[in-house]
Amino acid sequence: EGMAGKVSRVSDNLAETKVKIENALKLNDIVVLTGGISVGDHDYVGIALNQLGVKEVFYRVAQKPGKPIFFGTLKDKAVFALPGNPAASLSCFYEYVIPVLRMSYGRRDIFLTTLSLPLANGNSIQSLPRAQFLKAQIENGKVRILDGQSSAMLSTFALSNAQVYVKANASLINEGELVEVHLLPQ
């Protein structure tokens, strides 16, 4: 959507992680990191952000995929740390990062386009105690939930043109019932 960016890799090392993030904060208004934000032995992003003085706005959202997402600020800079699993990271990018990017360059329609569509035949959605973003395909005015919803499976996104949002603890949703659909950017 017309924004430039730089990709940089960092090893599982706290000092190197901190230096890379510090440099990114000097050069950019919005910094997006992927991986290293959970609670594993080699997840140093949260520690580095804390040491750099990034103020946490939120961390860990009750959703699937993408629970270990972080958003914070440092002065006038915005920092996102997205999960390391590819599909979880992409889902969070669509739902959280894109609105901030769009807002930063003055767009009024910052969120993904939202529709209410019936669930396709043969589909039903089970409730979870946390919100869900399900990769989906809109076909003939209905939305079909795709197989392969694992947060590590990026290939399903290649087939999807939407995400279905399901609130935490929602009732069972059966075929034909209306669901909230977020159109993915094309």
Give a label for each model feature.
Residues 1-33:
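Phosphate-binding glycine-rich loops and their immediate beta-loop-alpha structural context
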Residues 11-21, 39-60:
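Short catalytic-site patches enriched in acidic/histidine residues
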